[in-house]
């Protein structure tokens, strides 16, 4: 077993879904304020009056904090940490079946990815996948997450052929996930 250090568990009141009964504690997407759902670009955001932007600034900043630091949520009474990348996957990455569900084995994939990224001795992640595990969607979401944070970063896609990478992964997965991201 690989030991991975998680962030310190916050106070109960700071863990998502702490106010729900144990049997109803499961991952559920958090709704965006209705006024923000209509905004499609940063240009539209900056055209809004300062009062409007100030009203929702804390929401946007909280989303960036969750993206950067990850988030804790209650899962059937168990405080569970997910990385920022998994948060972006679950909260904002619309895939071919809609938004993904939380799956515990995918949490392990995201935690291992984060450990690989944090360890300068690590050359990467080798994952022998089976079909229908969601790994292609996970990697597509990670690509969009990274590409949308770093200017002029070169990222790659690997598949059976270049054509398959372009048509089935980039066009059908990466572009769809990018389009589902919020304006911020």
Predicted regions and their residues:
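Phosphate/NTP-binding elements of NTP-utilizing enzymes
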Residues: 1-184
């Amino acid at each position: 077993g690989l030991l991975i250090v998680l962030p310190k568990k916050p106070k109960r009141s700071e863990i998502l879904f702490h106010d729900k009964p144990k049997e109803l504690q499961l991952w559920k997407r958090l709704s965006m304020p209705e006024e923000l759902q209509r905004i499609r670009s940063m240009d539209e955001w900056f055209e809004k009056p300062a009062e409007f932007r100030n009203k929702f600034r804390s929401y946007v900043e909280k989303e960036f904090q969750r993206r950067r630091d990850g988030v804790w949520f209650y899962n059937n009474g168990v405080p569970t940490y997910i990385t920022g990348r998994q948060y972006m996957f679950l909260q904002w990455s619309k895939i071919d079946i809609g938004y993904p569900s939380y799956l515990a084995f995918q949490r392990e994939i995201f935690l291992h990815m984060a450990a690989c990224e944090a360890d300068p001795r690590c050359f990467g992640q080798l994952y022998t996948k089976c079909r229908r595990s969601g790994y292609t969607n996970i990697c597509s979401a990670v690509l969009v997450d990274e590409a949308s944070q770093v200017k002029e970063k070169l990222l790659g896609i690997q598949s059976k052929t270049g054509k398959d990478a372009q048509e089935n992964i980039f066009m059908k997965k990466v572009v769809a996930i990018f389009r589902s991201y919020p304006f911020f």
